[in-house]
Amino acid sequence: MIWKRHMTLEALNATSVGTLVEHLGIEYTRLGDDLLEATMPVDTRTHQPFGLLHGGASAALAETLGSMAGYLTTRDGQCVVGTEISASHHRAVSQGQVRGVCQPLHLGRQSQCWEIVIYDEQGRRCCTSRLSTAVMG
């Protein structure tokens, strides 16, 4: 297990109250030994003007997952800050929900790199994102 901080899904979701994460309807759904998952609805909150999932909403889901996963790998007195994010969009989604799966590519003392893959309800890859973070403290 890679996690140094232990939080329940209920506690993870409580951190979203009053934030963009809550506004977008993102909910943490699974904390595995080396992965963090969350879902996000595809609706008017996350659509672009043409009725499809907004790429920025996908990036927000990815950064939410990578940042929280990074935080969970730090010790007391440490935190992580995002330094770079990229997202490749593979497939349009117009309704339902998407699921993001976040796993580490690199966990160093001063930097981390996370891969976040976003799937539609049929399990098809919609977006591949990479988030780099700096470990502070």
UniProtKB/Swiss-Prot annotation:
EC identifiers of the protein: 3.1.2.-
Domain of life: Bacteria
Active site: 63
GO cellular component: cytosol
Assigned keywords, A-Z: Cytoplasm, Hydrolase
Subcellular location: Cytoplasm
Functional description taken from the UniProt entry: Required for optimal enterobactin synthesis. Acts as a proofreading enzyme that prevents EntB misacylation by hydrolyzing the thioester bound existing between EntB and wrongly charged molecules.
Family (UniProt): Belongs to the thioesterase PaaI family.
UniProt subunit comment: Homotetramer. Dimer of dimers. Interacts specifically with the aryl carrier protein (ArCP) domain of EntB.
The protein, known as: Proofreading thioesterase EntH
Native source organism of the sequence: Cronobacter turicensis (strain DSM 18703 / CCUG 55852 / LMG 23827 / z3032)
